[in-house]
Amino acid sequence: MKYSDLKYLAVDLPEAVMKEKWSGNFTGARKAIRRLLMSEGISYPLRCRLELELNNLDYIESRYTLSEEEALFVMQKRIPSMTAQELEELRIEDKADWMYIDGKVKFIDCFDATLYKVYPELWSATENGDESDYSLIQSVVDNAVLRMGESGQSKMTAHIHIRHDFNLKNEAVEKGKRLHVHMPLPLEKGSVKNLKIIKISPDCTSLPQKEDIQPTVYFDIEAGDGQVFSAEYEFDNELDYIDLSKANLEEIARTDVPEEEKKYLQEEFPHIRFTPHLTELAKELTGGETNPLLIVRRFYDFITTKTDYRFVRDYCSIDNIPEYCALNRRGDCGVQALLFITLCRIAGIPAVWQSGLDAKPGDVGEHDWARFYVPSIGWVYADLSYGGSSYIRGAFDRWNFFFGNVDPYRVPINDGFQKELAPAKIHMRIDPYDNQCGEAEYDDRGLTGAEVEYRYTEIDIR
């Protein structure tokens, strides 16, 4: 199966598999898949879909591991008075992600991680209340607006110096075999200025090229004990603040989208799909509006006010990510970004994925956001998860800021979703869609997320 065959996730599963899967009988689902794969007359797209589903089942089963009793124990660490009935209400309301596994309710291992960020009734029930700290971001917003008012121009800058380490767990090391490792690495383009690659260890086989959409440093090496792959770099992230509320709507309306940007209007299976539901949703939200900027603002408002920010299972185990977000009205940063991108493209507005790291002093981790094209203005940003967190806290200046802007405390690496690495991997990627943590494989098999470790070390962020 080729990397491009991921598009066949758009193929529906046979009913025999679906019945077993959603009843929680994963053993039965695997048996049904293997029986179908051995039968004659299976088309290539369906064969790929069934093979992908075997992988999906493994991911789902590995994540939905907490029993009801274990989940209640987790909740009681923050809310000691939490009862089993209250947990059940969270499950019924679909605020606590769960699934049937072998006939039993199992919660996803991260079900509680975002509850206290999203639902005021839960964070107010904890001893410390809302522990989210947005003071740095608020200062960025305040200063950007102030400088714009004083001079008409406002630049936002952060200096970021980090090290990314990646290694195989001991039990995954097969000494003497050829090991292939990809690690994400930013390129000097866009907002990334003065990039310095300080150290790559061990010696790499190749560095990313400027045309790479998901750039990586690549190692082709003999596997051995104690190997740690490391990339240390620093750069300045420089962004210009823009206040889209003051944009010239008439000029936007009379300016056409350039031909070179129209490639960002296309579907990209299996996820960026113009399904009947999403097409009608875009039409409903548009409501007859014709100005591109006002249309996009309606999409932004819908996602940031009507969908909940929630950690989700691995993307490779979700068949259609934007549809998942719209139907369930929840998703993490990338899920929300993909719904936004898809709605924009349906409406004829170019939009594209961007991802990398959220890099604030004391906190470095993966993050995804979106960019969209405004005629007569150009490419601007939308961060749906930061926008939603601002809205729920009544910080409407921050909410408006993240429509058109992102803060500079991030490492932009990837300029597209579901793009091939260079050189191409042989086997299924740990993350087939994004490139933030690292990938590894031997010639004869791919390595899973459970077989590797990675970490980001802050050296200097200011």
Predicted regions and their residues:
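Repeat-mediated protein-protein interaction surfaces in helical alpha-solenoids
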Residues: 1-3, 31
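Hydrophobic/aromatic-rich core segments of domains that either
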Residues: 3-6, 10-23, 59, 74, ...
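Acidic low-complexity segments
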Residues: 14, 21-24, 211, 225-323, ...
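Intrinsically disordered, low-complexity N-terminal segments that are enriched in acidic
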Residues: 22, 30-242
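Terminal peptide-recognition signature
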Residues: 181, 299, 370
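Active-site nucleophilic cysteine motif
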Residues: 292-299, 329-344
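Low-complexity, Gly/Ser/Thr/Pro-rich intrinsically disordered linker/tail segments
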Residues: 405-462
